Amino acid sequence: MIIGLFPELEPAGGIQRVGRHLAAVITEFAESRKMECRLLSLNDSPELHRMSVGDREFVFTGSARAKGRFTATALRSARRHAKLVIAAHPYLAPVAQGMRIAAPRMKSIVVAHGIEIWEPLSTLRRRALRRSNVILTPTQDTANHVATQQQIPRDRIRVLPWALDPDFENLAVATAQSSLPLNYPAGRVILTVGRWQSNERYKGMDTLITALPRLLHEWPDLQLVAVGDGDDRDWLEQMAKSSGVQGHVHFYTGLTSVELAACYSACEIFALPSRGEGFGLVYLEAMARGKPVIGGAHGGAPEVIDDGKTGYLVQHGDVPQLATSIETLLSDPALEREMGARGRERVNREYKFGVFAKSLKKILRELCES
């Protein structure tokens, strides 16, 4: 048996999307070896769920945030001759290690995403992480933090870049005006996508708003479109009003996948000048649509964005540098197209779901056969 442990799988979000990718590949791998597969989610509602990633279906059971129920189900599953457990977040590492009491020969993988391991974990979580056979990370930057902050031997850390979602990839090219959300602005558009939470201001949405007055002097039809919601939206809207650019900042929430794809297609530049991205799946989505991307010169973003070739990297909070990067692109449409084309080529070469699935299956095979 192979067991997968997940924080949650149904909601939107980068960690959730990676979880779905993992679940789909784990299921496919188990089926190919005629092994039983059990996928458990801590936060999702307590019934059997069915989801898919592209044409790969998987089922999982939720626990409605009941940690006791989740842990008990995991322990019972481990007793059924489990060979491998994959914990899709470091916070679930203690559950995975507890399962090894019931199945001492079972191997374990823990997935680290980024900012959650940039500081030392609690003693319990760090000890469980150290006892794992393999720690998967999406970038070398995250791998370095796992090694230094959590004191994990480097030979147990494997870098596995995340992938473009095949459902996004398979969408029909959504460029028609009718596919855009209602009241989408006319003009040249900078797009940003994220969660606008007060505890996640590292995303850099505020610096985009601060840069707008300078940019509007040269391009008065410029618009900033922000897809996502959060408790910081009121603060950001007030910032736009105080800066006199409220008519150029537009928030959209609850978009369909087709509407989101249309937003990527309709924008001229994608920007998320964050200092806390462990990877940045939204960069892949923009690159797949042939758009130049601007990200923070921090975390895992420099491993996704080729500075000066597929976009630009800027220091978090450096508004003049951010504005200059945007100006360079807006003033040179040929450069925009060139960078966008390079980004699309890189996604097609390195970040397709098939590449991710093949690499993950190789790791699963090694552990199952060792």
Predicted regions span which residues?
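Conserved acidic donor-binding segment of nucleotide-sugar-dependent glycosyltransferases
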Residues: 307-308, 312-319, 328-333
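Short alpha-helical donor nucleotide-sugar binding micro-motif in glycosyltransferases
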Residues: 129, 254-255, 262-267
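Conserved donor-binding/catalytic core segment of Leloir-type glycosyltransferases
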Residues: 183-203, 209-212
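Aromatic "clamp/platform" in nucleotide-sugar-dependent glycosyltransferases that forms part
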Residues: 275
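Nucleotide-activated donor-binding/catalytic signature segment of Leloir-type glycosyltransferases, i.e.
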Residues: 234-255
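Carbohydrate-associated surface elements
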Residues: 141, 163
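Short hydrophobic beta-strand element within catalytic cores of glycosyltransferases
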Residues: 292-295, 305
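A short, well-ordered alpha-helix in the C-terminal region of glycosyltransferases
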Residues: 321, 328, 335-349, 356-359
